């Protein structure tokens, strides 16, 4: 239900393809990856979930409690099963799976190395948190004796099958190396603002050849699953960091479309309207008082005059949102169920 609600909110914002970094697998929690894939299939969203993992608990010097971590062998075995069960390699696939240790600080070095090897063997993508804030730099230097970028390189992750979350703190040399490696970065502007993590150097990353897409992050650090909002925040933060002329709506739109496709290794297949691409389209109405007079540049009007939801969101030729409403027949039922479960979790007494 939670996955359905999050994906539904994304669809209403014009998102056609999403991923999820599912790295908590509580004991007795069931097959959560299959459950969220089922939610995406039911809604009609294109989905790239990751089989995430955490292997260092509190007793090992990590952050999570013991009951949500797994040992390396179990993680890798279940990752291979998930890929075999769900990963569709065909053109226009609606479901693909990536491997995603949570972060270099919540898994063993061996798991990072073996995950990269398994991704190579299975020909799937890799994802992890990277250089999110200054604390990450400090922790990496103290724990590994090197910066996060150097650690990523040392464990075999500096490849064009990798995309990372955040990428707030790389220096100029590292940005150039990330670009040469063909790495992707999911820029999460709202989350970075809420947590005061900093502003990712997206202009420099894009200039270096890094595929920069957008992430809405999760409910623990961002409260709106809106791709449109993240595009607007990305544009404004790039202006704040690098000057008013550093970003515009076209740049933000590219991050929300082609940049995301690059992160997922699907340039020319999704994220663009061209011969050979799938039928994914978001349609926006530029009518009404908020757009009055906004005629000269529809792209700037789209991003500056909102906030607005998509009029239509079409995935693989099928309407997921039509006339601003979800086409799913069970919207009210799903929201009622979600509200009941959320209330029970937040008020267990």
Model-derived regions: residue spans:
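His/Asp/Glu-enriched, well-ordered alpha-helical/loop segment
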Residues: 154-161, 203-288, 304-305
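Metal-coordinating catalytic core of metallo-dependent amide/deamination hydrolases
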Residues: 26-168
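Metal-associated gating/positioning segment near the N- to mid-region
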Residues: 1-34
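C-terminal cap of metal-dependent C-N hydrolases
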Residues: 278-335
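Histidine/acidic-residue-rich catalytic or RNA/ligand-binding cores of hydrolases
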Residues: 59-60, 134-146, 172-179, 196-205, ...
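Catalytic beta/alpha-barrel core
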Residues: 162-170, 187-192
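Divalent metal-coordination and catalytic microenvironments
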Residues: 14, 40, 99, 129, ...
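Glycine-enriched alpha-helix->loop->beta-strand junction motifs that scaffold or abut catalytic
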Residues: 44-46, 116-125, 157-160, 177-186, ...
């Amino acid at each position: 239900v939670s996955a359905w609600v999050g994906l539904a909110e994304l669809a209403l914002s014009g998102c056609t393809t999403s991923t999820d970094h599912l790295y908590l697998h509580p004991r007795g929690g069931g097959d959560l990856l299959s459950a969220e894939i089922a939610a995406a299939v039911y809604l009609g969203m294109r989905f790239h979930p990751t089989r995430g993992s955490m292997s260092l608990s509190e007793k090992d010097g990590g952050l999570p409690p013991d009951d949500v971590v797994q040992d390396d062998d179990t993680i890798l075995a279940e990752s291979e099963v998930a890929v075999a069960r769900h990963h569709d390699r065909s053109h226009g696939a609606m479901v693909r799976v990536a491997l995603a240790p949570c972060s270099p600080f919540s898994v063993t070095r061996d798991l990072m190395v073996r995950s990269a090897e398994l991704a190579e063997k299975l020909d799937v993508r890799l994802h992890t948190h990277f250089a999110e804030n200054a604390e990450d730099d400090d922790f990496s230097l103290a724990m590994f004796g090197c910066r996060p970028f150097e650690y990523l390189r040392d464990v075999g992750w500096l490849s064009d099958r990798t995309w990372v979350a955040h990428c707030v703190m790389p220096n100029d040399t590292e940005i150039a190396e990330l670009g040469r490696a063909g790495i992707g970065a999911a820029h999460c502007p709202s989350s970075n603002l809420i947590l005061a993590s900093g502003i990712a150097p997206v202009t420099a990353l894009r200039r270096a050849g890094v595929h920069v897409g957008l992430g809405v992050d999760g409910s623990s650090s961002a409260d709106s699953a809106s791709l449109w909002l993240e595009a607007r925040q990305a544009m404004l933060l790039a202006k704040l960091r690098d000057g008013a002329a550093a970003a515009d709506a076209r740049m933000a739109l590219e991050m929300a479309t082609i940049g995301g496709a690059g992160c997922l290794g699907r340039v020319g297949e999704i994220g663009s309207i061209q011969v050979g691409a799938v039928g994914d389209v978001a349609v926006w109405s530029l009518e009404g008082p908020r757009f009055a007079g906004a005629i000269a540049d529809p792209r700037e009007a789209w991003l500056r005059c909102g906030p607005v939801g998509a009029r239509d969101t079409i995935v693989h030729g099928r309407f997921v949102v039509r006339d601003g409403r979800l086409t799913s027949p069970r919207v009210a039922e799903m929201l009622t169920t979600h509200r009941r479960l959320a209330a029970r979790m937040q008020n267990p007494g």
